[in-house]
């Protein structure tokens, strides 16, 4: 019969076996590589002189508790990483052995701390149950003990202690964070132009919908599908390009996707029927979506978290200004030439230029850069156990599906705070596309303007968005000041949305109130100024709010946002024209104004009560509030 003392002793021993691994290594000097006379071709193998020790890692601030992975950490591997700092830290040697991490107290990738505690509690519970039950049989008790022992043995660390994880070395020129500031900002501008190119492509046809009607002899609603289907493609493309980026890098994802996008503009221009055009436009959306789903990550790759806010603010300007250029440019193209194909040739030229330019941007994704470094070191040293943690774990299709598909859907049905935030982003994005079809009714039918002059009416939106860009820098400075005073909360990110929300609602009230023939065109056109200003501020602020609320699963939360935003952007154009004709110019605008006015409460309500709502309505708190030392 197994008594209580033996099980308690068993619990203690198993607990020690998990957390043991050895404080001997921490007392040793950095491990030496034995020089080798082997030659690889005409080159002697590289002899690395040292690797990091527990002491050196502790001096760099590493502790037993693994921090939360970076926002850009790979999503194609399991989540229980023992070295999540690998992709953001620099070490003097560039190599951190698994044995050293285990000596530091890090558990293996195969077992999480929570699982360890769960097993220990299970052992303790069984001990108490056996002490309380005098009628238990010996056989049952032995089975319990064997079950726990088996559970523990199955969860032993699986990583080879001789594996050495590669990191950037101190001051590493291949680390994007160490590139000259002007280079990083130049790449930020180029990548933002890539986003503008993609967003422009979605709305390029709105400046000449009548050319689609004339070309294929279809109605306006059928012609509008050429815009909506590309936006739907935006929502599905990230399912392809996010895993490609994780596995092979952002540069390759951009090169392949933008190349396909450029090529598929050719059948758009030459399609003999509407069906062919719609299929190709959808595929253009799928291929070009890499620009929308990866550029934010590329910019984050180049800037530390403390300084990336301004660069991300600049990026937030791009997806909302790109569509505005579509009717602005192609209104003149369609009126002057009456050729639908020329609109797509221009779009192809724009995409082709960006394809070539982006091809010259070096890889920015740290996991892939380190993977290349590890391969080089394996070749030069002959040590096959130098690798990244992503390589050591291998690709997890299960985790990839969770990150790209299952978790975004799970968040959509279980996170009301995320749903409300995404709904507001979706509303603003949808209203932008609604303007593309409301302005032709207001300025075309009321004032008698042609598409070229209607396109000019979008300039105020562009001006308002530019003004908002300057305000985002102000918001970022205020946030940095706050961070120096106290620990930030996700709600601190809502300052920009609180400024922009009233402007977005006011724009629609102005549009409705000034849509009369006896009022000069400046009245309804000025609504775009307020809308552009509020639109960019709301998107910038809520995007950061989502990241801080779901920091550990930010990519999945943002995927939820992209899907809902694209769905709204695709749907609104399909009924905007009919809504303005059925309700009238005033009440159609005011209906949207009522909705936008009600949504003003969201950033203010979340600012004051967001933390309480997240705790009450969310299944789990994923925010920066739960991260110690953040």
From Swiss-Prot:
Classification via Gene3D superfamilies: MFS general substrate transporter like domains (1.20.1250.20)
Residue ranges, compositional bias (Polar residues): 1-35
Pfam family, one: MFS_1
Residues glycosylated per entry: 135
Keyword Hydrolase in record: no
Ranges of compositional bias, category Low complexity: 125-137
BP terms from Gene Ontology: spermine transport
Keywords: Cell membrane, Glycoprotein, Membrane, Transmembrane, Transmembrane helix, Transport
Ranges of Basic and acidic residues composition bias in the record: 37-46
Localization annotation: Cell membrane
Transmembrane segments: 190-210, 222-242, 252-272, 282-302, 312-332, 342-362, 423-443, 453-473, 494-514, 519-539, 553-575, 587-607
Induction text: Expression is up-regulated under spermine stress and depends on the pleiotropic drug resistance transcription factor PDR1.
A GO CC annotation given for this chain: fungal-type vacuole membrane
Membrane topology qualifier: Multi-pass membrane protein
Transmembrane helix found in the keyword field: yes
Region (Disordered): 1-46, 107-157
CDD domains in UniProt: MFS_Tpo1_MDR_like
Biological role stated in the UniProt entry: Cell membrane polyamine/proton antiporter, involved in the detoxification of excess polyamines in the cytoplasm. Involved in the resistance to the imidazole antifungal drugs tioconazole, miconazole, clotrimazole and ketoconazole; to the triazole fluconazole; but not to the antifungals flucytosine or amphotericin B. Plays a role in spermine homeostasis, but spermine accumulation in response to clotrimazole is independent of TPO3.
Similarity-based family: Belongs to the major facilitator superfamily. DHA1 family. Polyamines/proton antiporter (TC 2.A.1.2.16) subfamily.
Name the UniProt record assigns to this protein: Multidrug transporter TPO3
